[in-house]
Amino acid sequence: MGTGMERREFLKLMGIGGVVFVSGLGPLAHAAGEKGTKDDFFFVQLSDTHIGFSDPKVNPDFAGTLKKAVAQVNSLSIQPDFIMFTGDLSHTTDDSKERRKRLQGFRDIVADLKVKTVRFMPGEHDAALDNGEAFQEFFGATHYTFAHKGVNFIVIDNVSDPTGSIGDVQLQWLAGELQKLDKDARIVVFTHRPLFDLAPTWDWATRDGAKAIELLMPYKNVVVFYGHIHQVHNQMTGHIPHHAAHGLMYPLPAPLSQPKKAPVPWDPAAPYKNLGFRGIDAKVLKADYVITEFPVKKG
């Protein structure tokens, strides 16, 4: 498993609103502004909002950061076809009533989004202590599929099992869903944890993630978007790119860059540093995904 990306597979550019990446195997003309087709579309990924977290040393605006992100999404000049939240909607709590209160608080905030199609998946903070019971009460299934303009989306739950596994039953479901697709189908996978072993000692891995990757490998056009690690990170497993997103409550340090994983303290000189969301412009015919990172704005 290599950590680098060849130029043909991964190109970093500077773009309006943040850093733009081109993810995919198609020609790089998209990055230079090639005209899109009628089937191209745009969606937004937000992650790790951690409603219920309340340490002002880490984020003094813990009650307002998600609201700022919602306002920024609403102000985008092109509204997305849909929005995806990739887990840790709430911050962990042992109290089942408090867990539901936090999930309700999250839902109340995101109800202000202009876009009507908003999808959700759990993180371990939402689901690991009750196998996803509370999450399902508010948002429905923890794993599912949907299709949009020729792209097949697969949402994998690797958090409801407290061992950090997908589990045999869900892997069988995944195999069945993939069998319905042609080998050159456009496939986008959403997970919370990384499917590969990024930093297992920090819980940045999925115990049986290699089995999911093995099922995906025969398909030519697959990309994975995930959260959990609270930072942008890009890695290839074979021909499959995996893209981690910024969080919206606090950043975390680079993988294994210090003895223990802990939130990065708030920097008053650079408020909201490394907090943000991303837009993904899907170029369907050539299976490219142009990723724009949007930092949270003060005010």
What function would you assign to each model-found segment?
Residues 49-52, 89-92, 124-128, 159-162, ...:
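Solvent-exposed loop/turn segments at secondary-structure junctions
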Residues 46-47, 83-87, 118-124, 190-191, ...:
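Active-site neighborhood of phospho(di)ester-bond hydrolases with catalytic His/Asp-centered motifs
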Residues 35, 95-186, 208-223, 235-287:
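Extended active-site neighborhood of metal-dependent phosphoesterases/phosphodiesterases
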Residues 199-211:
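A contiguous binding-surface segment within folded domains or other stable secondary-structure elements
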Residues 13, 30-100, 183, 198:
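N-terminal active-site segment of His-dependent metallophosphoesterases
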Residues 1-4, 9-31:
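N-terminal export signals
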Residues 291-299:
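C-terminal/domain-terminus segments
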Residues 182-198:
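Short acidic, glycine-rich surface-loop motifs adjacent to enzyme active sites
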